[in-house]
């Protein structure tokens, strides 16, 4: 499975940084691409701001070179949730979005479009 993220395809709609950026405004940070499995792709997109938790990230994908983008589930918004499983894991989620594109075809190259918005 090959993943292709073209810089012009990853877009973030966020206010221009300046001295008076609202704490409610989302500021995109590092985008982490998880190692692909045979049929899934995973993403983590760290952010700053969005104190009102109303930002979102829409996800679309297509086979490399195909014309039509197909919608996937949006990334999940996380900020400060405790993730706990007995003695195996205990962490507080950072300010971020995370999610996956599921049920892909093995041996196929995909393009993924992530669009961040903050009303």
Stretches found by the model and what they are:
Residues 1-8:
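Bacterial N-terminal signal peptides
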Residues 115-119:
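Beta-strand-rich extracellular modules
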Residues 58-107:
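Recognizes extended acidic, P/S/T-rich segments that occur
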Residues 46-49:
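Short amphipathic, basic-aromatic surface patches that mediate peripheral association
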Residues 39-43:
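Structural beta-strand segments of beta-rich domains
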Residues 30-34:
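Short beta-strand segments of immunoglobulin-like
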Residues 15-25:
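Proline/serine/threonine-rich low-complexity linkers at boundaries of modular beta-sandwich domains
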